[in-house]
Amino acid sequence: MKKLVLMILFMTIGITMVSAQNQAEFKFDQITINVGTFPASSPVKKAVFTFTNVGNAPLVINEVIASCGCTIPKYDRRPIAPGQKGSIEITYNGQGKFTGHFKKSITIKSNGRTEMTRIYIEGVMEGGK
């Protein structure tokens, strides 16, 4: 009985270790992009976040969630092979928003080693509302 329990334990540990080795992983060039200072009369700014899959399995982005309706993500839903690059384009639209500094977070859900990753877009909108 003892041998059976030990054998099951070692098999479970072995399977866990093998599955942990085959994982996708993000490596972003930048976590935060500052779009600078811009006038409220031109309230739309874009930022492109590039990343590399540094893992050893295909990276699949399941969902990209912006913290505000003024921030729109655009990304490729196809898997990113190990060693390949991908990008996520973020469009900030400050029309009707208060002027001043802003920092918006974007949460990325994936099959990566870290299931949720956050990136940020920030800047300063000047002028009237």
Residue ranges and their predicted role:
Residues 4-14:
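Sec-dependent N-terminal signal peptides
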Residues 10, 18-22:
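Boundary at the C-terminal end of the N-terminal hydrophobic targeting segment
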Residues 21-50, 54, 125-129:
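Beta-sheet-dominated interaction scaffolds and their linkers
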Residues 42-48, 97-105:
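Short, solvent-exposed loop/turn segments enriched in Ser/Thr/Gly
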Residues 54-57, 96, 112:
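Short, acidic/polar linear motifs in exposed loop/turn regions
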Residues 56-87:
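Surface-exposed binding patches on compact interaction domains or structured appendages
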Residues 107-115:
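Short, exposed beta-strand-loop hairpins at the edges of beta-sheets
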Residues 117-125:
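C-terminal edge beta-strand
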